[in-house]
């Protein structure tokens, strides 16, 4: 068990408070004797309502907002303007050991692909590597599933320390907009930040595109330190902003153009679709920053595998009906995926898709418009409805489609079976939205 003097973690405490810290938690139910409880206000829960429970379970200090009214004669109450920021600062001291080369990748789409490709490149070059993101926390033979793209602050720092203890110095983290906004990635010594792209998503949380972009740019504006690297695509509209930030903060801006051109001339990459070349370019540049030689990278490219659930060909039937699976759950990703399929398949494309509940509702008509324009048969089904009524979500999509080629099928498995049953020889079926996920 890691323990540390409280005054070493939190300098603002009176010097007489020589209390041993055994752990940190944002969940009152997980508090044990000797833990600090961070009473954080979230979307669904207010941590300040659970301070009493944390104290009864043995919390030795409470961190909360300046507005918090809680008082205790024996336990220090540390009030701060931003408890989330304060948590990441304390975590960086409590979990002291971190890998030398930490790469963070953000953007609307492509984070998981970049992370997976980076992991493959380093593994194939016999460099110990880890990845943290949508596919879980992966290193050596460990693959721990997580519910979040970016784990909560404590779990993230703890995971990084475990990775370091396993003698791994290279790690890539998927930095989601939620994770960045909630300061989960603050106070990490990140060697390079990758910006993949930017399009509409998560407006249920961020409320506007400006706020959403601001969250993404937090990585470059506030987390990356002087002389660290920024990797991005020159053709993006946001590249100009990244250039300004890089100049102001004296960051090294690296664009993918040269590497991407080399990849287009390379005939050895068989398992990746053309639209993955940008993601591969970013992964290669990140690998180079981790001291992997470019020649050695290009030597192993023929061994690179497609990313699980990213335009993955999962089945070919005897009559040449092809079934692809993709994680596309934003208008931009869906359009790019369909266009990529059209480029390599001259045949009709049918789609099975839905939209997630309790998420950006403005995406639904936009995604309907895309499939209406590009797909022959459309099977609208459920996709993680969460707390919304599934039928209502499907109806919002269907109201933007033609009746003669769209089908409303509640059960996802039935929708897939129906699409395959109704398919003509040589037809392409795209199952979009869930990618690698196996549960609803």
What are these regions (language model features)?
Residues 1-18, 30-36, 42, 49, ...:
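ATP-dependent carboxylate-amine ligase
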Residues 1-89, 93, 237, 241, ...:
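N-terminal leader/targeting and accessory segments in enzymes
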Residues 133-155, 159:
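P-loop NTPase switch/communication element
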Residues 51-56, 164, 186, 342:
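Non-catalytic positions within long, well-ordered alpha-helices that form the structural scaffold/packing
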Residues 35, 54, 90, 105, ...:
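Residue-level signal for inorganic ion chemistry
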Residues 6-7, 64-73, 164-175, 179-182, ...:
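Acidic, Mg2+-coordinating active-site environments of NTP-dependent enzymes
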Residues 60-66, 194, 229-234, 352-354, ...:
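Short internal beta-strands
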Residues 91-136, 142:
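Walker A (P-loop) phosphate-binding motif
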């Amino acid at each position: 068990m890691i323990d540390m003097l409280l005054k070493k973690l939190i300098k603002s405490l009176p010097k007489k408070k020589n209390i041993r810290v055994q752990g940190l938690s944002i969940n009152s139910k997980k508090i044990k004797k000797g833990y600090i409880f961070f009473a954080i206000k979230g979307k669904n829960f207010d941590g300040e309502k659970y301070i009493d429970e944390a104290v009864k379970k043995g919390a030795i200090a409470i961190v909360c907002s300046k507005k918090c009214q809680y008082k205790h004669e024996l336990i220090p109450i540390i009030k701060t303007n931003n408890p989330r920021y304060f948590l990441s600062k304390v975590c960086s001291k409590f979990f002291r050991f971190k890998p030398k080369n930490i790469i963070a990748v953000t953007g609307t789409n492509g984070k998981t692909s970049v992370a997976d490709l980076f992991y493959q490149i380093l593994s194939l070059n016999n460099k110990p590597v880890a990845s943290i993101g949508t596919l879980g926390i992966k290193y050596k033979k460990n693959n721990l599933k997580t519910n979040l793209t970016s784990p909560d602050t404590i779990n993230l720092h703890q995971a990084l320390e475990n990775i370091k203890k396993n003698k791994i110095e290279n790690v890539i983290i998927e930095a989601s907009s939620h994770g960045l906004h909630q300061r989960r990635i603050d106070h990490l010594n990140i060697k390079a930040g990758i910006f993949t792209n930017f399009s509409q998503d998560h407006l249920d949380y961020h409320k506007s595109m400006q706020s959403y972009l601001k969250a993404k740019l937090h990585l470059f504006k506030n987390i990356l330190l002087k002389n660290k690297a920024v990797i991005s695509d020159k053709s993006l509209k946001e590249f100009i902003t990244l250039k300004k930030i890089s100049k102001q903060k004296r960051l090294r801006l690296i664009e993918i153009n040269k590497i991407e051109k080399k990849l287009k001339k390379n005939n050895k990459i068989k398992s990746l679709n053309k639209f993955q070349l940008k993601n591969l370019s970013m992964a290669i540049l990140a690998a180079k920053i981790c001291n992997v030689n470019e020649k050695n990278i290009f030597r192993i490219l023929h061994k690179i595998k497609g990313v699980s659930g990213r335009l993955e060909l999962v089945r070919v039937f005897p009559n040449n009906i092809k079934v692809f699976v993709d994680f596309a759950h934003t208008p931009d990703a869906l359009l790019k995926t369909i266009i990529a399929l059209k480029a390599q398949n001259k045949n009709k494309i049918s789609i099975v898709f839905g939209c997630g509940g309790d998420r950006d509702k403005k995406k639904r008509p936009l995604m309907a418009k895309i499939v209406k324009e590009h797909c022959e048969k459309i099977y609208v089904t459920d996709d993680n409805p969460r707390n919304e009524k599934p039928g209502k979500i499907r109806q919002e999509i269907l109201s933007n489609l033609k009746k003669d080629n769209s089908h409303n099928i509640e059960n996802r498995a039935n929708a897939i079976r129906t699409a395959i049953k109704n398919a003509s020889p040589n037809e392409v079926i795209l199952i979009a939205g869930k990618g690698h996920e196996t549960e609803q």
